[in-house]
């Protein structure tokens, strides 16, 4: 039987160890690369355009821009403060792990039954939101109008679209009057009856499902100042 000399055995052993290390290196390097990429701070102003968000569906819009983990604490503190300021005037919830303020209005308070024009009382209910929208880089705004399941699918689609247009137009009038700036990003969604809060099996539940949602989503200035520790 052929045997290896001590020197040949050591050489082959070292070669095998080197090969294992070489094969393992790309995996370690790849893991380190993705770890660094995950921790990398991306300029939140990049890609923050109305055109980009208009092309997104509803849920991706609620999820973006993302907040870097270093900025999360500051963003959440600001979002909670906003919710505190609004809670005595409107119905407020915190979503996306306390990174987003959700304001909900029953559409019965904004519109007459089966009507699509905002009432005077409805515009008065929306007005307290405007002072918090003055800085267009602090928040992205998403509007979502929901219906119950009454009537045909076509009717529900048309109703939610018409009501959404009425709300959106009201915000555009606020732009024209100088109450908010033209470059504030407002993304509208007519949701029809696709996302009910409750089964449409009672009158109260149907009323609960008929709603306007207004989302305050962290904008690039809020994220950037939170990341840099510059929030007041």
Q: Model features per residue range: what roles?
A:
Residues 2-15:
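Bacterial N-terminal signal peptides that target proteins for export
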Residues 14-24:
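Bacterial N-terminal signal peptides
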Residues 29-100, 116-117, 124, 222:
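N-terminal targeting leaders that direct proteins to extracytoplasmic destinations
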Residues 67-74, 114-121, 125, 135, ...:
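Extracytoplasmic/periplasmic, Sec-exported soluble proteins
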Residues 75-96, 111-145, 214, 221-226, ...:
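Periplasmic peptidoglycan-binding/anchoring modules of Gram-negative envelope and division proteins
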Residues 101-106:
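Short, aliphatic-rich beta-strand segments
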Residues 108-112, 148-151:
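A short, flexible beta-alpha/helix-coil linker loop
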Residues 147-230:
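Periplasmic OmpA-like peptidoglycan-binding domain that tethers envelope proteins to the cell wall
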């Amino acid at each position: 039987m052929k045997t290896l000399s001590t020197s040949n055995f050591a050489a082959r052993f070292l070669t095998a160890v080197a090969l294992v290390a070489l094969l393992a290196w790309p995996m370690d390097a790849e893991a380190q690369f993705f770890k660094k990429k995950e921790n990398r701070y991306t300029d939140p102003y990049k890609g923050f355009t109305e055109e980009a968000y208009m092309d997104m569906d509803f849920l991706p819009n609620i999820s973006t821009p993302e907040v870097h983990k270093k900025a999360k604490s500051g963003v959440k503190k600001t979002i909670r403060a906003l919710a505190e300021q609004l809670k005595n005037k409107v119905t407020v919830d915190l979503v996306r792990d306390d990174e987003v303020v959700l304001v909900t209005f029953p559409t019965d308070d904004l519109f007459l039954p089966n009507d699509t024009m905002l009432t005077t009382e409805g515009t008065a209910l929306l007005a307290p939101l405007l002072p918090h929208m003055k800085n267009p880089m602090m928040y992205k705004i998403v509007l979502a109008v929901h219906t119950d399941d009454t009537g045909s699918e076509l009717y529900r689609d048309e109703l939610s679209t018409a009501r959404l247009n009425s709300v959106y137009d009201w915000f555009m009038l606020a732009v024209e009057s100088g109450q908010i700036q033209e470059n504030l990003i407002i993304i509208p969604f007519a949701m029809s009856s696709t996302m009910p809060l409750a089964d449409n099996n009672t009158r109260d539940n149907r009323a609960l499902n008929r709603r306007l949602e207004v989302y305050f989503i962290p904008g690039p200035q809020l994220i950037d100042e939170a990341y840099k520790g510059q929030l007041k």
